[in-house]
Curated annotation (Swiss-Prot):
Protein name in UniProt: FHA domain-containing protein FHA2
Broad class of the protein's primary localization: nucleus
Stored PROSITE patterns: FHA_DOMAIN
Compartments it resides in: Nucleus
Disruption phenotype: Slightly enlarged leaves, small siliques with few seed set, severely reduced fertility mainly due to reduced stamen filament elongation and defects in pollen development. Increased polyploidy levels in cotyledon and leaf cells.
FHA domain ranges (all copies): 32-89
Biological source species: Arabidopsis thaliana (Mouse-ear cress)
Modified residues (N-acetylalanine): A2
Amino acid sequence: MATAVGGGSDVEVGFAKLQGEDFEYYMQSYSIILGRNSKKATVDVDLSSLGGGMNISRNHARIFYDFTRRRFSLEVLGKNGCLVEGVLHLPGNPNVKLDSQDLLQIGDKEFYFLLPVRSILGGPLGPRHHVSGQTSVVPYHNYQSGPGSGSGKKGVRSRELYEYDDEDDDDDDDEEDDMRGSGKKTRRDGHEVVYASGEKKREGRSKVDREADDQQFLQLEEKDVVSSVATVLSDLCGPGEWMPMEKLHSVILKEYGNVWHHSRVRRYLSQEDWAIPEAKGKPWYGLLMLLRKYPEHFVINTRSKGRVTLEFVSLVTLLS
């Protein structure tokens, strides 16, 4: 199976997972672009290389977490549109709410959008509508089963056995709630469903678990930012070359300023969170502090001109 792991990491964790017949992608950032790579730009998921056919635009669709509505959504960008559960959505239409196990088709490529069942830390995934703010999105592993689980049949429509954990479904009745707590099996829409054992109504996770999840989230966010910086430096710098932090900040801001969540932009691309003299006039200060945490990947060089200190950065691989 061809594997595309999000965020430049080979760790199988993320906020959500895309599962096709011959590929999987772990979403490790707030927003990803699906489409096809070109000479000038790359996308997070290159569906053209995965057999998506000729009707895929460079930037065909965007899957992102909508913090206002606390849910994942699909924005259609490509002129040929996207199918979600058999319904065609075109550019200019309202963004599409994505539920776990929704079947998407872009071009000739079909795949499922899956949300996790359990947290990285082993605890149950609490009700999503009880969590607020940035921590609405926490990285998880152990996803609901993708296409063709245990069936051996060709094609992504052969989903059979999976765990069902769509707690945003307002149509669940009392009988289903009882089964959620008992660990029993029932059938839903012609498919066998396995409910995980646990409390009938989950009351959310402990403060310690939430803090641990927050820390895990920040680590994944750091990896995503570091991966983005490394990509920019490798594309724009040759062997032995350095890039001024001011220029790096400008490139990153242009490339990701409208893609990253505003809290990430504020943390790494502005000086709002850094009320200290050293950060004055340096909106890249947060980014600089992050890169200093990874000396195995980045080399920071400083030069002073009077009272002004200039920072330059390069990749270890470009200087070795």
